[in-house]
From Swiss-Prot:
CDD domains, sorted: bS6
GO BP term, pick one: translation
InterPro entries from the UniProt entry: Ribosomal_bS6, Ribosomal_bS6_CS, Ribosomal_bS6_sf, Ribosomal_S6_plastid/chlpt, Transl_elong_EF1B/ribsomal_bS6
Listed Basic and acidic residues bias regions: 117-131
PROSITE patterns registered for this protein in UniProt: RIBOSOMAL_S6
Molecular-function GO terms, alphabetical: small ribosomal subunit rRNA binding; structural constituent of ribosome
HAMAP family registered for this protein in UniProt: Ribosomal_bS6
Record-given protein name: Small ribosomal subunit protein bS6
Domain of life, source organism: Bacteria
Role: Binds together with bS18 to 16S ribosomal RNA.
GO cellular component annotations of the record: cytosolic small ribosomal subunit
Family to which the UniProt record says this protein belongs: Belongs to the bacterial ribosomal protein bS6 family.
Region (Disordered) residue spans: 94-131
Length: 131
């Protein structure tokens, strides 16, 4: 079995359907003795250029280990699913299990946002003293 990295761009109007679609693709891979090494939902992002007058898409990344027949079946499902506006399949030498740079950056951004304290309007009232 070979290792593959798949990126799907889903129509933004179908973002709520992504979970069900991903579950179907995972089930197909696992039913054919494949393995999911990494799954990341990057959410809705701006496209570099419009595709069919669409400016945003919902991105999903998979790293899988599967055989050629299952991969061909997945690609056919992607091709005939109108909700998927683009798909990319790359063969990898090894299984990639670590978090992608995009996901790491998003985690760091969330952590910075959580540690940044916003001034509270009640703090000004707590500092006065009664004379």
């Amino acid at each position: 079995m070979r290792h593959y990295e798949l990126v799907l761009l889903v129509h933004p109007d179908q973002s709520d359907q992504v979970v069900g679609m991903v579950e179907r693709y995972i089930k197909l891979v696992q039913d054919n003795n494949g393995t999911i090494h990494r799954l990341e939902d990057w959410g809705r992002r701006q496209l570099a250029y419009p595709i069919n007058k669409i400016h945003k898409a919902h991105y999903v990344l998979f790293n899988i280990e599967t055989d050629g027949e299952t991969l061909a079946e997945l690609e056919e499902l992607f091709r005939y699913n109108d909700a998927i506006i683009r798909s990319l399949v790359m063969r990898r030498d090894d299984a990639v299990t670590e978090e992608s740079q995009l996901a790491k950056n998003a985690d760091e951004k969330r952590a910075r946002k959580a540690t940044t304290r916003r001034p509270d309007s009640n703090d000004d009232n707590d500092n006065h003293s009664d004379d």
